[in-house]
């Protein structure tokens, strides 16, 4: 792997000037154009979804959409399977910061109309949804009916398909695992056009049932390189109107690690959500949530943090721990789930620097946040070069007992705060994330998002040092982010045994790109 010398990356004075203007004044375009456009898009799409639910047209439409996908694949097979298959979703709609290069010479299959909720089964306690359904859609649909997902990742625009083919972790994950672990079945279309329904049936008797069973475990994290996901059946649980959220300040790194380990007991009956934020290397806050019907007395605080005029959540947390060592609030459930959406965690502070100003919040924040897809589509190349040099967007998944070492390394290499910490339960199952030395273990997602000013930061070299540490502790790297691992290093991090077997047995090798070719940095621009 060739590394670019840092001296070759240094911009000219003119480039620095242009970058400064584009970075610090991007809001001039975002606020008057992207905010209204995002608000209009969300309003129209929400109205469309309400009509679809009212007339119950989604199930019949789903059959037609799947048939259209099968027809496209039949045509591709009849033409001799001459190119690789990819979905036709535009690159700017994906959650990755980069645009895919592997799609340029591939056959694009139109799967981009799969964005409906298909069925709610309250007897089996499942919801069936197409892969384009977002977490915002699901939370709105389910909570109004008294249900929720055990794991519902925070950002509104995250999709079912992205969380299965990629990865999903959320504050309920310490108890239920990753998003893939709450899925009970997948509906997929294979490269030959065959429609399959696959389940994790451990009691499978026939050879075909065993084949389909193994396919179920091969799909998560596979990035759509085995089949086309057209629907998923997902567990649901009953919910209450509020989350009783306890904020606990920690004053040292060791205290954070010890307390977070203690609080991440998945057998706890009084805790339903666990996450933490580090505001510098020592100061942090652990947040413990519990489903609740609301406050028992008038003295207890109800905080609807999802209202447009409310502070960005992470700033609210920091304000609280600066005043008190421990606080309790009652937050409406949907507001809690999407607590990081309004500020896109803390990325919006660089795009709209005054976005948390009280005047802006009251006058303009009802249109926030700008859609991530629109931000990505309108990022100019000159700004991408700046991001290449200084922007960090990484989620590293490491064993919880290695958290202190991991934070030490992140502080040394990138020093971006806040830092997101989300513990999750990882059980050993077949697939790319198979644990090789345990049956189950508590992990933690360490998320670093933003622009670093750390001296000596080099996008490739620094990322490779982080990747090396994660591999050394049997951790994993979320593959939406920039990945600089070699093919061999990727195979060291992820267990490709089942993946490669299903690729061969399901005739995928000539049909889909290899997963490494899709997620490596050279496959994206």
From Swiss-Prot:
Q: Which UniProt keywords apply?
A: Endoplasmic reticulum, Golgi apparatus, Membrane, Oxidoreductase, Transmembrane, Transmembrane helix
Q: Name one GO biological process term.
A: steroid metabolic process
Q: What is its main location?
A: endoplasmic reticulum
Q: Name one GO molecular function term.
A: Delta24(24-1) sterol reductase activity
Could you confirm whether the keyword Protein transport appears in this record? Answer: no
Q: Where does it reside?
A: Endoplasmic reticulum membrane; Golgi apparatus membrane
Q: Which Pfam families match?
A: FAD_binding_4
Supply one GO CC term from the record: cytoplasm
Indicate the transmembrane segments per the record: 27-47, 214-234
Report membrane topology. Answer: Single-pass membrane protein
Per the UniProt entry, the Enzyme Commission number(s) are 1.3.1.72
Keyword hit for Plastid = no
Name the record gives this protein:
Delta(24)-sterol reductase homolog dhcr-24
């Amino acid at each position: 792997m060739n590394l670019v010398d840092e001296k070759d990356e240094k911009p000219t004075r003119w480039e620095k000037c242009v970058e400064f203007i584009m970075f610090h004044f991007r809001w001039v375009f975002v606020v008057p154009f992207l905010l209204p456009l995002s608000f209009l898009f969300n309003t129209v799409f929400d109205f469309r979804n309400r009509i679809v639910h009212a007339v119950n047209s989604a199930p019949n439409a789903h059959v037609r959409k799947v048939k259209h996908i099968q027809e496209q694949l039949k045509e591709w097979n009849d033409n001799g399977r001459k190119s690789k298959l990819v979905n036709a979703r535009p690159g700017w709609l994906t959650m990755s910061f980069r645009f895919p290069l592997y799609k340029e010479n591939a056959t694009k299959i139109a799967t981009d109309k799969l964005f409906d909720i298909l069925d709610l089964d309250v007897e089996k306690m499942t919801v069936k949804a197409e892969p384009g359904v977002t977490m915002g859609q699901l939370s709105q649909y389910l909570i109004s009916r008294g249900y929720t997902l055990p794991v519902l990742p925070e950002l509104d625009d995250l999709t079912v398909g992205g969380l299965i083919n990629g990865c999903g972790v959320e504050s309920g994950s310490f108890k239920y695992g990753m998003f893939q672990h709450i899925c009970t079945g997948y509906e997929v279309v294979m490269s030959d056009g065959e429609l399959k329904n696959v389940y994790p049936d451990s009691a499978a008797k026939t050879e075909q049932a065993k084949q389909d069973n193994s396919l179920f475990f091969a799909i998560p994290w596979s990035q759509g390189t085995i089949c086309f996901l057209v629907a998923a059946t997902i567990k649901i649980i009953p919910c209450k109107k509020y989350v009783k959220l306890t904020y606990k300040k920690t004053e040292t790194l060791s205290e954070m690690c010890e307390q977070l380990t203690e609080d991440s007991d998945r057998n706890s009956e009084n805790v339903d959500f666990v996450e933490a934020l580090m505001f510098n290397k020592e100061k942090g806050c652990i947040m413990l949530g519990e489903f609740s019907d609301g406050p028992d007395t008038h003295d207890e605080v109800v905080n609807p943090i999802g209202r447009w005029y409310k502070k960005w959540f992470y700033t609210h947390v920091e304000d609280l721990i600066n005043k008190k060592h421990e606080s309790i609030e009652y937050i409406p459930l949907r507001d809690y789930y999407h607590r990081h959406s309004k500020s896109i965690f803390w990325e919006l502070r660089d795009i709209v620097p005054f976005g948390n100003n009280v005047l802006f919040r009251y006058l303009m924040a009802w249109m926030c946040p700008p859609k991530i897809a629109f931000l990505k589509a309108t990022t100019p190349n000159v700004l991408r070069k700046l991001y290449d040099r200084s922007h960090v967007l990484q989620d590293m998944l490491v064993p919880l007992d290695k958290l202190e070492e991991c934070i030490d390394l992140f502080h040394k290499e990138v020093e971006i705060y806040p830092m997101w910490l989300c513990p999750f339960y990882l059980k050993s199952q077949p697939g790319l994330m198979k644990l090789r030395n345990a049956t189950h273990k508590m992990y933690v997602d360490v998320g670093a998002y933003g622009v670093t000013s750390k001296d000596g930061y080099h996008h490739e070299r620094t990322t490779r040092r982080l990747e090396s540490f994660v591999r050394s502790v049997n951790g994993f790297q979320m593959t939406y982010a920039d990945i600089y691992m070699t093919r061999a290093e990727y195979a060291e991090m992820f267990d490709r045994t089942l993946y490669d077997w299903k690729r061969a047995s399901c005739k995928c090798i000539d049909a889909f790109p290899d997963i490494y070719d899709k997620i490596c940095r050279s496959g994206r621009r």
